[in-house]
Amino acid sequence: MTVIFPNFSKSSVLIVGDVMLDRYWYGPTDKIAPEAPVPIVKVNKIIDRPGGAANVAMNIASLGARSRLLGLTGVDEAAKILKKQLNESNIKWNFISVRTCPTIIKLRVMSRNQQLIRLDFEQYFNNVDTTKLLKQVELYLPKYKVLVLSDYAKGSLNCIEEIIKLARYMNVPVIVDPKGIQFSRYKGATLLTPNISEFESIVGSCRNEKILINRAQEIIIDYNLSALLITRSERGMTLCTRYAAPLYFSTQKKKVYHVTGAGDTVVGVLSAALSSGKSLEKACFLANLAASAVIKKSGTSTSNVTEMKNIMNSHICTTLPVGILDEKTLKQTISVVRNRGEKIVMTNGVFDILHSGHVSYLTNAKKLGDRLIVAVNSDGSTRRLKGKTRPINTLEQRMFILAALTVVDWVVPFYEDTPSRLVAYLSPDFLVKGGDYHVCDIEGSQGVLNRGGTVRVLNFQTGCSSSNIINAIKRKN
């Protein structure tokens, strides 16, 4: 994916949510306490950083974008520290001071780059009249291009349904970083960004990618969302939308020091990029670059454009759509993997009733290279090739089953009688067919050979064919 970094100074984001102070006590650990089997930490450094929704604002500010933060705090020293640090980062804020509740503090004790314990100083903001907060949102929302709702389930967003309705009325995109199992609260939002644990707490354990994608689509439909972005720590991110194939934003394996605040970084960079006019896909790409940077840092951190560019230039982070793709998207994806030196294998067929012969053949085809494309005859093409009674399964059904195979990277349909045009357009390194073909008889073979590619004929499992299966069923009936 080719991404030009936006001019973030033109971005504007309104953040509403649970603000908190992340406090860190650092010190060496050399011995065990005599009164209990616990380590003694000699604290020699204390660091305070804005956390929660405030960390989202810090990440936006680190890009040079304009933002405003709305939320609830107590009337205490922590609130003063939080406001001071936000001022130093040129972040505008409007907090409602609640005398009956303290400002939320998350205290982490750190030693030798390890977190030993976390102590939470907080009280749920219940019985707090959020009318003032709603009025502030109504006042400031027209001045910003994107709205972020950072929900840590601390009570600041008890009026979240009304805020989302207001944003929809004003036609402002809403990004929600959710918490808890009541996703119905976020109905009508543009995008939800749960981490994998939060997502599975709603839909149950996802044993494989296909289950995860299907359940994500159900969430999108049930709650009238435009998209769902699932963050997966060092495994990157998965973007699901209503009508397009899922996108996987993966990171190379690296040492992960801390994931504290990584979700805030994703939401912050994502919102700033969307506000600048980037597409959702490119905004997610940039957010994943930033997350790749912050998980290597200690404590609550932010990322900047320079770090993101360095990661992109070193090819640490890539984005690859998988599964069923259109020709244009597939062509772009092939270009990405080719730049990394990967070899492309392509085959084609009807694949009407998938059987063990198909699976064995596709497995052997994949071994020739790094990525396997399966081009599938359309229903009309199949009828012209096989007769009026075929296909048994529709094009959509056949492609769905093929995309579920782990050896298949991409599935693409073609509507002509032969795949020659598609083969020429995609230019695979290996063109493969199974059966008794001669290389010169394989459609598209000459073009592949002329470009320096390879054409191979693989053995097909004897006796295995869709036609044989259909005839056997007819005989039994």
From Swiss-Prot:
CDD domains: RfaE_like. One of its GO terms (cellular component) is cytosol. HAMAP family: HldE. Residues 346-477 are annotated as: Cytidylyltransferase. This is Bifunctional protein HldE. It catalyses: D-glycero-beta-D-manno-heptose 7-phosphate + ATP = D-glycero-beta-D-manno-heptose 1,7-bisphosphate + ADP + H(+); D-glycero-beta-D-manno-heptose 1-phosphate + ATP + H(+) = ADP-D-glycero-beta-D-manno-heptose + diphosphate. Coiled coil: none annotated. One of its GO terms (biological process) is ADP-L-glycero-beta-D-manno-heptose biosynthetic process. Homodimer. It comes from the Bacteria. The active site is at residue 264. One of its GO terms (molecular function) is ATP binding. Catalyzes the ADP transfer from ATP to D-glycero-beta-D-manno-heptose 1-phosphate, yielding ADP-D-glycero-beta-D-manno-heptose. The keyword ATP-binding applies. Pfam families: CTP_transf_like, PfkB. The lineage of its organism: Bacteria, Pseudomonadati, Pseudomonadota, Gammaproteobacteria, Enterobacterales. ATP binds at residues 195-198. Pathway: Nucleotide-sugar biosynthesis; ADP-L-glycero-beta-D-manno-heptose biosynthesis; ADP-L-glycero-beta-D-manno-heptose from D-glycero-beta-D-manno-heptose 7-phosphate: step 1/4; Nucleotide-sugar biosynthesis; ADP-L-glycero-beta-D-manno-heptose biosynthesis; ADP-L-glycero-beta-D-manno-heptose from D-glycero-beta-D-manno-heptose 7-phosphate: step 3/4.
